[in-house]
Amino acid sequence: MRRALLGTLRRTFRSGHDGRSDEPQPPAEPPKAFYLVGEPGYPNYGDELIAGEWLKFLAARYPDTPVVLDCARPGPAAVILRDRHPHAVFTDTLRRLATENPFPYDGPIDDIAGFVARALRDDGVAPNYACGIRLLQHDVQSVHVLGGGYMRGDWTCNLSRLSIGPWAREQGIPAVGTGIGLMPISGDSLDYARRCVAAFRSFTVRDAATYDALRADKDAAAVTGLAPDDCFINGLDGCYMPPEGLPDTMLCVQSDFVDDPAALYARVERTLERWNVGKDAGIGVVECNPRIDAPIFPYLRDRGYANLRFFPTVELLERGFPARPGQRWISTRYHPHILAAAAGCSGSYLSVGPDYYGVKHGAVLRMGSRWTQIAMTGESPMPGEGFADQGIVQRYRDDIRRSVNGIHPDA
């Protein structure tokens, strides 16, 4: 506002009292930036998918408005998402404030979040990041915390990013959150999240457990809604790899969050046998998190599976997700479940952690998947069907766009 006012005064002074002048006029002030908070850059496919889809949306609707995306690894994120928006800048201001402070990493939320809040108000609290803080203070028109599962109760450094909501309200900057999952969360972390969420103009979550936890507080309940995953913002247009040559059977099986990966892989192998997938059948192994999702490939190879194809993370990021109708999937991960089920694939999921991945897979079932769950004991089920209503993807797109009316009224 101050810069715009000064620009108006300068133009009036040059033009004289009648407001006319033959002199060239200075260029108009550039619009203030959309400020996004997310988690692309590790990479971990779903986070890049969500951030990339929002950047595509903003590039199509507001091509001349700059975007700042605040994430933990802005360097890799900038390269991965380099073609999504013509005026995107990547930074890690909030992440740095959350991790470079006097308190232990993932220590008490009130300590870490208190530091973040003080620094946002006074850049002298964190002078190394004063430029990023001042950008927030002076050059931002809205704040949008993107969806994902990167904030939860025990990841307090990540969770402290919600402090941007109360700060934005103090500054008169509209803030929204979309498609967020906070589970597992309880105690001080939940109290903190409720206080922060109440300051947002709107705040949608992707799972019922997060929804119920936030709505137990009346102020947070007033702005909290239950929504689909952010990946649907553009109706999944352009998210898939060309279907030609993709295997009929696909796996995405992680090794993190698992006490005994070998037992998990053995369970997957027994499920393949139950589904009559022979050792000469084509099987795709999808990696969403580099190295973390790869070990099942040598496990199956060593057991005689001879027609395996590996899909590394970089291929997904560059070419899209390898799902097509007619496939059968086994996945421990959340976004492969969403994208494959939405594409009409049948499948089953394994939950490697009931309070985290169990909540995630439950959210996909609510969104429309009919996949079956594979338990670690007993006979594996046959695969369940994907989304019954293919039109729901477009309705989800419209729902998400309506949820950001507070910052994009023409969305």
Each model region followed by its residue ranges:
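Active-site anion-handling motifs in enzyme catalytic cores
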Residues: 1-411
